[in-house]
């Protein structure tokens, strides 16, 4: 048995992005602002100092 997202030709990451967007779009307006703030991704790059 193959997962539906695999049958559609999607990767799991893309499938989860689509699901998350659908959930955020279905939220009531009072909860939407908080969900939009947390939906972004943060990346921190740290350069290692050579001694």
UniProtKB/Swiss-Prot annotation:
One GO term describing the cellular component: mitochondrial inner membrane
Leader sequence residues: none
Subcellular location(s) of the protein: Mitochondrion; Mitochondrion inner membrane
InterPro entries: ATP_synth_F1_esu_mt, ATP_synth_F1_esu_sf_mt
Name listed for the protein in its UniProt record: ATP synthase F(1) complex subunit epsilon, mitochondrial
Coiled coil location: none
Tissue expression profile of the protein: Ubiquitous.
MF terms (GO), sorted A to Z: hydrolase activity; proton-transporting ATP synthase activity, rotational mechanism
Keywords assigned by UniProt, alphabetized: Acetylation, ATP synthesis, CF(1), Disease variant, Hydrogen ion transport, Hydrolase, Ion transport, Membrane, Mitochondrion, Mitochondrion inner membrane, Primary mitochondrial disease, Transport
Family: Belongs to the eukaryotic ATPase epsilon family.
Residue numbers bearing the N6-acetyllysine modification: 21, 32, 37, 44
Gene source species: Homo sapiens
UniProt-listed Gene3D superfamilies: ATP synthase, F1 complex, epsilon subunit superfamily, mitochondrial (1.10.1620.20)
């Amino acid at each position: 048995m193959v997962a539906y997202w695999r049958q559609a030709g999607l990767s799991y990451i893309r499938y989860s992005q689509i699901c998350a967007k659908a959930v955020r779009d279905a939220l009531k307006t009072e909860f939407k602002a908080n969900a939009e703030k947390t939906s972004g991704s943060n990346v921190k790059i740290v350069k290692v100092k050579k001694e």
